[in-house]
Design a protein with these regions (language model features):
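Transmembrane alpha-helical segments of polytopic membrane transport and secretion proteins
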Residues: 1-38, 261-274
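Periplasmic/extracellular loop-to-transmembrane helix junction in inner-membrane transport proteins
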Residues: 16-28, 51-96, 235
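Short cytoplasmic-facing helical segments at TM-TM junctions of multi-pass membrane proteins
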Residues: 163-205, 229, 233
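C-terminal transmembrane helix and the adjacent membrane-cytosol boundary/short C-terminal tail
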Residues: 112, 169, 200, 204, ...
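Generic hydrophobic transmembrane alpha-helix motif, especially the helices
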Residues: 123-159, 166-167
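Transmembrane alpha-helices
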Residues: 150, 154, 186-220, 247, ...
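Transmembrane-helix boundary motif in ABC transporter permease subunits
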Residues: 92-122
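Glycine-rich helix-loop "coupling/hinge" segments at transmembrane-helix boundaries
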Residues: 138-139, 168, 215-252, 271-274
Length: 274
């Protein structure tokens, strides 16, 4: 019995204090295997359905045709130019919208007067989708990059503002009062108590905004562009190049997925105590 107990303790220590049961380990491996096979199975099913004759291959091309269209897109030299144009719009819009969202979220969350002034307006504007602004953005900015960035900033800003606003309001008011009573400068109090306390909410809002920035990219490039992934999708659709349309959609989805994974890894380092 003592030997069994000591062995159990050793296993617990090696697994971080938790004894992993064989069933849970097996289930985890099965889940990983299923996840790894899901995409290949989907691609195979797609290929079979497309070539079965039950659908029009021109409108629903198989993955092999889509892959060939993407390779041709890359060989033409246009792909990387389109990729960089879209990434520039997403990244710049995300940075500007995120920074404005955090700044105004802290102000409206911390100061009731500013909240009373701005929050009603923001709540009215927030539900308006960026694509609804495409006609007026073209009138205001023409086909310049400013209009495209405006649309991405619009989509990112309200998501980050709302999460920051809620996060700041969730900070313990007792800590703030105690810090001010002890003579802590207001700027230091905002940085070390308010911002730090709201940080988990801010990070969640920013991660959500990563995906939203790609949604709004569609509206931005439909507002008139001469390069970009969505622009190329639109041109391919007009020429009935369905393979390139689907290839562009796949590229857009992959870009969004990679950006989300990278931000999730960064978020784990930023909010390490959660």
């Amino acid at each position: 019995m003592p030997e069994a107990t000591s062995a159990g303790r050793e296993i617990a220590i090696r697994t971080g204090g938790r004894v992993r049961r064989p069933n849970s380990v097996r289930l985890r491996r099965i889940n990983i295997l299923v996840g790894a096979l899901s995409i290949p199975l989907f691609v195979c099913l797609w290929e079979l359905v497309s070539r079965s004759g039950t659908v029009n291959m021109v409108l629903f091309p198989p993955p092999t045709v889509v892959a060939a269209a993407v390779l041709e897109w890359i060989r033409s030299g246009q792909f990387f130019g389109d990729l960089l144009a879209s990434l520039f719009r997403v990244t710049t819009g995300f940075i500007i919208g995120g920074a404005l969202g955090i700044l105004l979220g802290v102000l409206t969350g911390q100061f009731p007067v500013i909240s009373s002034l701005l929050s009603p307006l923001f709540h009215i504007l927030r539900p308006i989708p960026p694509i609804a602004f495409v006609p007026i953005v073209i009138l205001w900015f023409g086909l310049s990059e400013t209009g495209k960035l405006f649309l991405v900033v619009w989509g990112v800003f309200f998501t980050v503002w709302l999460s920051t606003h809620i996060g700041v309001q969730k900070v313990d008011r007792g800590l703030i009062r105690a810090a001010l009573m002890l003579g802590t400068p207001r700027r230091q109090m905002l940085q070390e108590i308010v911002l730090l306390g709201a940080l988990p909410y801010i990070v969640v809002g920013l991660r959500t905004a990563v995906s939203i920035s790609f949604y709004t990219l569609v509206a931005a490039e439909l507002a008139g562009a001469f390069a970009g992934i969505v622009y190329r999708i639109e041109i391919a659709q007009q020429n009935l190049q369905t393979g390139q349309v689907m290839g562009g959609l796949a590229a857009l989805g992959l870009m969004s997925f990679i950006a989300d994974r990278l931000f999730a890894a960064l978020a784990e380092r930023i909010v390490w105590w959660r």
